[in-house]
Amino acid sequence: MALVQRIPISSSSIRNWQQARTNLTPICCLHYNTASSSSSPFTEKHSVERYQRDQWLYKAVEPTPPSTPSPSPFEDEVFVRENDIASQLPELKKLLAVLKEKRVKGCKGGDCGPGDVYLVGTGPGDPELLTLKAVRVIQSADLLLYDRLVSNDVLELVAPDARLLYVGKTAGYHSRTQEEIHELLLNFAEAGATVVRLKGGDPLVFGRGGEEMDFLQQQGIRVQVIPGITAASGIAAELGIPLTHRGVATSVRFLTGHSRKGGTDPLFVAENAADPDTTLVVYMGLGTLPSLAQKLMDHGLPSDTPAVAVERGTTPLQRTVFAELKDFATEIQSAGLVSPTLIIIGKVVELSPLWPHCTKESSCLVETR
């Protein structure tokens, strides 16, 4: 049985970004209730709330009375599927027409270039980890396309007259294909809009930002990347884990648990990944962790290597499981961690001030916020 520890960490430094904003008429409406919205972007319920929030309505709409029941958790997935953002296409076309007309009127001599596209990393979850440049760009955007891992706290920074469009993906459900996202970015940039593509973490670390940048540059669109704090850095700092440390770890390696080829076997694990002097950080690795852990031990990584899994890192819902590699997969399953979860494997994990709370005989589930 896992040893459960509750370690209090002061939340006084966490700014309250969730003040009610009733003036966001271009963004809100339908059944969205800003007063009751949680900051967690990771459940289907919040996917529904985001869908409702992001309806682009160009006419006055009375909000649904608070007494109106929202879909039950069991209905959420069906609700999201039946209300796919394809229903927003008519409004997208309207917005494109408005932007194109505005662009033509504002042009001098009929020579107008396309708008700019920014790929913006929003960090691992805590809005205070945003860069100043990211905040400035977010607040100046005409249109923002955002992913599942972008927190509601970050979305509260969007200007009142900006337009939001959710293009996130979950296992088994993609609100938009990658190709459709490319076309949306291109069409609005060609219409002269300032377009921001919001991504969790860093856009160029397992975020497919390179694909979007390459596509747009081939179409003659200028793309600027605003880096974000990737989950590995943000979460390691949160737990006091140095990813490299003199005499302990001389390198760090980022891996992905999702292979484009599919399947459950982590094909990305090579023999040199089992180097005891290397820190391994695995993104999206919950499904392949049992195979990964076994393969690492088969290649010589000691079975007592410290490891940690962090669910929803740097957010108020963060949960953390510490364990030795031989018990890691079992303890994660026992704790019921869900995506998004980051995994760190290596001797540096033992340097975390939270690690001494765990005994050699037991794993440790820590709720740190």
Swiss-Prot record:
Its EC number is 2.1.1.107. S-adenosyl-L-homocysteine binds at residues 124, 200-202, 230-231, 284, 341. Mostly expressed in leaves, and, to a lower extent, in stems, flowers and siliques. GO terms for molecular function: uroporphyrin-III C-methyltransferase activity. Residues 1-28 form a transit peptide. Pfam families: TP_methylase. It catalyses: uroporphyrinogen III + 2 S-adenosyl-L-methionine = precorrin-2 + 2 S-adenosyl-L-homocysteine + H(+). PROSITE patterns: SUMT_1 (PS00839), SUMT_2 (PS00840). Induction: By light. Accumulates within two hours in etiolated seedlings exposed to light. It comes from the Eukaryota. It is found in: Plastid, Chloroplast. Essential protein required for siroheme biosynthesis. It is a step in the biosynthesis of siroheme. Promotes nitrogen and sulfur assimilation as well as photosynthesis efficiency by triggering chlorophyll, nitrite reductase (NiR) and sulfite reductase (SiR) biosynthesis. This is S-adenosyl-L-methionine-dependent uroporphyrinogen III methyltransferase, chloroplastic. The lineage of its organism: Eukaryota, Viridiplantae, Streptophyta, Embryophyta, Tracheophyta.
